[in-house]
């Protein structure tokens, strides 16, 4: 009888820990998604971005975007023109930053939705897991507009390995 009671208590404690771990991991993923969405909005709405993007000015975008990337600790940021061609890109690495890495961004589903001007029930930003040349990455993509005219897109991404590490750390904390 004592061993049954003890086993039930252990089982309930284990279930509680599983629920807590699951909630913590879910919260970690929510924070990553929120940080990405905040980054997309900040970059797309910062003064000078539309002008630098229209001029295809890497230097102009770098002066504006890099401080946002550094201060917000964003892992990956790409700014694309309306055809999906990269105008600016930066990826945080252990050594610093890799710049202007290229990929077929226009073929990626969340980019296609944004550049087509599509909207769903949640708005004009899209999220997708992409098999990028630098590894599986969760991207949030939003439009860059000059008034009502779509002139490009901002992509903010987090490598899947970083997401897994954040979720694991949160669930064991």
Residue ranges and their predicted role:
Residues 79, 143-144:
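Hydrophobic beta-strand positions
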Residues 1-55, 72-75, 82, 135, ...:
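Juxtamembrane extracytoplasmic/periplasmic/luminal helical "stalk" adjacent to the first N-terminal
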């Amino acid at each position: 009888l004592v061993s049954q009671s003890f086993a039930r208590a252990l089982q309930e404690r284990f279930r509680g820990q599983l629920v807590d771990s699951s909630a913590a991991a879910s919260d970690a993923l929510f924070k990553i998604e929120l940080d990405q969405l905040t980054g997309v909005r900040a970059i797309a709405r910062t003064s000078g971005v539309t002008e630098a993007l229209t001029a295809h000015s890497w230097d102009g975008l770098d002066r504006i975007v890099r401080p946002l990337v550094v201060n917000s600790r964003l892992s990956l940021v790409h700014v694309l023109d309306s055809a999906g061609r990269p105008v600016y890109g930066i990826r945080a690495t252990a050594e610093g930053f890799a710049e202007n890495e290229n990929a077929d961004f226009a073929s990626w589903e969340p980019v296609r939705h944004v550049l087509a001007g599509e909207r769903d029930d949640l708005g004009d930003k899209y999220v997708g897991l992409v098999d990028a040349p630098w590894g599986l990455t969760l991207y949030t993509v939003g439009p860059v507009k000059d008034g009502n005219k779509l002139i490009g897109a901002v992509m903010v991404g987090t490598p899947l390995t970083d997401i897994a590490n954040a979720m694991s750390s949160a669930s064991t904390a």
